[in-house]
């Protein structure tokens, strides 16, 4: 998190992180949110080794941890580790009706304003976690976030163990010892399109747009590399999943994008309940 402060040790008992034993110094690479004893929610692009099940045993999900760096490793008494999931479900592409190419990336469209791509991933842990002082779920939202045209909407909280300097994936020295937290503001989707039409025209209208009001002009608080998959908490509710931002981070005129949790509640609840679920190779909802 760029421009943030150290999170209070009791602020984020729902925050987990994905850790790989094969990435050398880059061992931590994505945030996650615990939503009940068996399930965590993260960004779909955190699905490392998607076609190599034999590699999954090198991936760990750590919960209840506050000090996450190898330089200052201070364990909480109630930390828990889970190996790669029992199941994972990705909210994926729709069969394409139209393709558009932006900066050599193929965007697949379902209708005139909804772009469906890999946005988020539900992971079922290999065994349930036990709730404790530093491990507790973050409830799914009961209402959508608010944002007004050209005005500051909800005040939202971001957090994670991602980079604390603006450079794009630097050394481990730019990763914090403990998670960083910052307050940012939610903006109307059209406001973000006005600031950065190159990228925001390719993102679905249901995407949440958030950043620092002054930073929109001169750069400021922002998520960065390693914060992907972490939560966006607005008015105390879990409203977004970090999945896209500027490179370098915290650039002027480039607010970050978050997948909107509220708009996918039915899908998430269906998956957790063991019901039907949708992938890109099935009929679109």
UniProtKB/Swiss-Prot annotation:
Belongs to the peptidase S1 family. Snake venom subfamily. Homologous thrombin-like enzymes are N-glycosylated. This enzyme does not contain the consensus glycosylation sites, suggesting it is not glycosylated. This is Thrombin-like enzyme TLBm. The keyword Protease applies. GO terms for cellular component: extracellular region; secretory granule. One of its GO terms (biological process) is venom-mediated fibrinogenolysis in another organism. Expressed by the venom gland. It comes from Bothrops marajoensis. SMART domains: Tryp_SPc.
């Amino acid at each position: 998190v760029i421009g943030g402060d150290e999170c209070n040790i009791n602020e984020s008992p729902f925050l987990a992180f994905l850790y790989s034993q094969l990435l050398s110094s880059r061992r931590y690479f994505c945030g996650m949110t615990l939503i009940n004893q068996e399930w965590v929610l993260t960004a779909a692009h955190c699905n490392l080794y998607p076609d190599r099940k034999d590699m999954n045993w090198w991936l760990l999900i750590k919960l209840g941890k506050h000090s996450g760096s190898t330089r200052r490793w201070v364990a909480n008494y109630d930390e828990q580790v889970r190996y790669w999931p029992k199941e994972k479900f990705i909210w994926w592409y729709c069969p394409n009706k139209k393709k558009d190419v932006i900066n050599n990336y193929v965007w697949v469209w379902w209708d005139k304003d909804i772009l469906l791509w890999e946005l988020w991933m539900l992971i079922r842990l290999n065994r349930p976690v036990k709730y404790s002082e530093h491990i507790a779920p973050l409830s799914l939202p009961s209402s959508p976030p608010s944002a007004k045209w050209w005005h500051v909407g909800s005040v939202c909280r971001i957090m994670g163990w991602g980079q604390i300097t603006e450079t794009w994936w630097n050394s481990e020295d730019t990763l914090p010892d403990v998670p960083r937290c910052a307050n940012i503001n939610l903006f109307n989707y059209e406001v973000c399109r006005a600031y950065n039409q190159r990228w925001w025209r390719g993102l679905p209208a249901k995407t949440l747009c958030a950043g620092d009001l002054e930073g929109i002009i001169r750069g400021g608080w922002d998520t960065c590399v390693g914060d992907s998959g972490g939560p966006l908490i607005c008015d105390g509710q879990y409203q977004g999943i970090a999945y896209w931002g500027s490179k370098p981070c915290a650039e002027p005129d480039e607010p970050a994008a978050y997948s909107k949790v509220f708009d996918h509640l039915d899908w998430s609840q269906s998956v957790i309940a063991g019901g039907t679920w949708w992938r890109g190779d099935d009929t679109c909802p």
